[in-house]
């Protein structure tokens, strides 16, 4: 089924000094008209209530960038071995209480779900601010934090699920990029 609220935009060019994903996201952002803009990954699965709940949470928390940590779908043997360890390492490096603290902040965001207030996204320069960063999610968190706006990260509790890598080769290259 096609949703009339979704437009598929094709882009066949990317400036040399840009990461491809950032370039594509920037193009999409130029077409966004609402007060909030959401960037997500194609391998995520949303609960029907996720976006509504996320916008309500961002407003309630006065967050200009709200990111959600997905519930990882683990089906392959290598995921069973590595995903729990890798996730634990990420949470040790970026403790949730520090991410969401107003005083001892450690900026972090998860690229699987980046919900921006459109005004903050525009104020920081949008994807131009992170155009060549392979970890644009963390870069965005730092830029938003440095601008004085608030970044918040929440756990998905099953509302956002992700099966990150379809093969062992993509699994290896994906985690190498992160670490």
Question: Which residues does each PLM region occupy?
Answer:
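Catalytic metal- and UDP-sugar-binding loop of GT-A-like glycosyltransferases, i.e.
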Residues: 11, 40-42
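Acidic donor-binding/catalytic loop of UDP-sugar-dependent glycosyltransferases
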Residues: 42-57
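Conserved nucleotide-sugar donor-binding
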Residues: 33-35, 110-124
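Acidic donor-binding segment of Leloir-type glycosyltransferases
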Residues: 1-15
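A recurrent flexible, glycine/aromatic-enriched loop bordering the glycosyltransferase active site
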Residues: 72-74, 95-115, 156-163
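Catalytic donor/gating beta->alpha subdomain of glycosyltransferases that bind UDP-sugars
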Residues: 58, 65-91, 119-122, 127-179
């Amino acid at each position: 089924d096609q949703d009339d609220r979704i437009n598929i935009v094709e882009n066949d060019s990317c400036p040399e000094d840009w990461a491809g994903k950032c370039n594509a996201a920037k193009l999409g952002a130029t077409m966004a008209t609402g007060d909030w803009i959401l960037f997500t990954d194609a391998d995520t699965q949303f609960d029907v209530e996720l976006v509504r709940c996320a916008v309500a949470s961002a407003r309630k928390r006065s967050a200009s960038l709200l990111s959600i940590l997905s519930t990882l779908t683990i089906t392959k043997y290598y995921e069973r071995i590595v995903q729990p360890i890798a996730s634990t390492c990420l949470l040790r490096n970026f403790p949730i209480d520090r991410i969401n603290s107003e005083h001892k902040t450690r900026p972090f965001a998860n690229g699987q779900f980046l919900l921006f207030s459109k005004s903050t996204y525009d104020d920081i320069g949008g994807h131009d601010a992170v155009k060549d960063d392979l970890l644009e999610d963390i870069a965005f968190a730092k830029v938003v934090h440095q601008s004085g706006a608030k970044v918040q990260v929440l756990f998905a509790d099953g509302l956002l699920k992700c099966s990150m890598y379809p093969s062992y080769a993509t699994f290896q290259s994906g985690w190498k990029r992160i670490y």
